């Protein structure tokens, strides 16, 4: 069963609140990010979210114009770098402090709206 974005956020919050789970999960997550290499291409984590989902499409339409253009630029630049088998110079890599979620608030908002619409569509009047 596919998970919703809100359930993933709740799971992440739970892991970060638990000291034991946090000691295990945070270093593993940091190593995963380092090995995945998306920051070396100038991408942010939210750039990796698949766009084939209606909720993601809605969230992308709600993005501010400048953030949307920046996202498209990063993705096109990463594709070009991959085609030429190059990486960005180290000073142009996405830094961890720059890799903040810009799409998540819009995803959660779109997911809540879709859930509300589904509930209202299933409403039976007597």
From Swiss-Prot:
Primary location group: mitochondrion
Gene Ontology MF: a single term: ubiquinol-cytochrome-c reductase activity
One Pfam family named in its UniProt record: UCR_14kD
Stored PANTHER family: CYTOCHROME B-C1 COMPLEX SUBUNIT 7, UBIQUINOL-CYTOCHROME C REDUCTASE COMPLEX 14 KD PROTEIN
Family (UniProt): Belongs to the UQCRB/QCR7 family.
SUBUNIT field: Component of the ubiquinol-cytochrome c oxidoreductase (cytochrome b-c1 complex, complex III, CIII), a multisubunit enzyme composed of 3 respiratory subunits cytochrome b, cytochrome c1 and Rieske protein, 2 core protein subunits, and additional low-molecular weight protein subunits. The complex exists as an obligatory dimer and forms supercomplexes (SCs) in the inner mitochondrial membrane with cytochrome c oxidase (complex IV, CIV).
Name used for this protein in its record: Cytochrome b-c1 complex subunit 7
Annotated source species: Eremothecium gossypii (strain ATCC 10895 / CBS 109.51 / FGSC 9923 / NRRL Y-1056) (Yeast)
Gene: QCR7
């Amino acid at each position: 069963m596919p998970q919703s974005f809100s359930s993933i956020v709740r799971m992440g919050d739970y892991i970060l609140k638990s000291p034991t789970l946090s000691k295990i999960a945070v270093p593993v997550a940091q190593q995963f990010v380092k090995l995945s290499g998306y920051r070396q291409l100038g991408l942010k984590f939210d750039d990796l979210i698949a766009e084939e989902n209606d909720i993601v499409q809605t969230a992308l339409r709600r993005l501010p114009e400048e953030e949307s253009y920046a996202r498209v630029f990063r993705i096109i630049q990463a594709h070009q770098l991959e085609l030429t088998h190059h990486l960005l110079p180290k000073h142009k890599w996405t830094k961890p402090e720059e890799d903040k979620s810009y799409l998540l608030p819009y995803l959660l908002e779109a997911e809540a709206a879709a859930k509300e619409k589904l509930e209202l569509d299933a409403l039976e009047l007597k």
